[in-house]
């Protein structure tokens, strides 16, 4: 147990950050799951809508250093390839 006032504050701050980061990570996984579901169903308009939201969430997560910027870019790139594969299958 921390004795210093600043150490106790650090513990509280860390707990708040951990909770917020966990919520944000969960949100990222949820949007990724929704996008994959839309891609598998072949619904391009839904996939593009969800991709836009996911892209925004990934950029925000990278900005707040929840994930690395290159990790966010890689995930967006791979999801874009999957969305483009919908067109290829339809054609």
Swiss-Prot record:
Swiss-Prot/TrEMBL GO biological process terms: translation
Ranges where the record places region Disordered: 1-26
UniProt keyword annotation of Ribonucleoprotein present: yes
Taxonomy, superkingdom: Bacteria
GO cellular component, as recorded: cytosol; small ribosomal subunit
Pfam families on file: Ribosomal_S20p
UniProt-recorded Gene Ontology molecular function terms: small ribosomal subunit rRNA binding; structural constituent of ribosome
Gene3D superfamilies noted in UniProt: Ribosomal protein S20 (1.20.58.110)
Keywords: Ribonucleoprotein, Ribosomal protein, RNA-binding, rRNA-binding
Family: Belongs to the bacterial ribosomal protein bS20 family.
Record's function text: Binds directly to 16S ribosomal RNA.
UniProt name for this protein: Small ribosomal subunit protein bS20
The encoding gene: rpsT
């Amino acid at each position: 147990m921390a004795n210093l006032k600043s150490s106790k504050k650090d513990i509280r701050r860390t707990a708040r950050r951990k909770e917020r980061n966990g919520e944000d990570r969960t949100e990222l996984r949820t949007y990724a799951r929704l996008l994959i579901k839309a891609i598998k169903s072949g619904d391009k308009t839904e996939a593009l809508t969800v991709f836009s939201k996911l892209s925004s969430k990934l950029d925000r997560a990278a900005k707040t250093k929840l994930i690395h910027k290159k990790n966010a870019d890689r995930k967006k790139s791979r999801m874009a390839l999957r969305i483009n594969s919908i067109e290829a299958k339809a054609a």
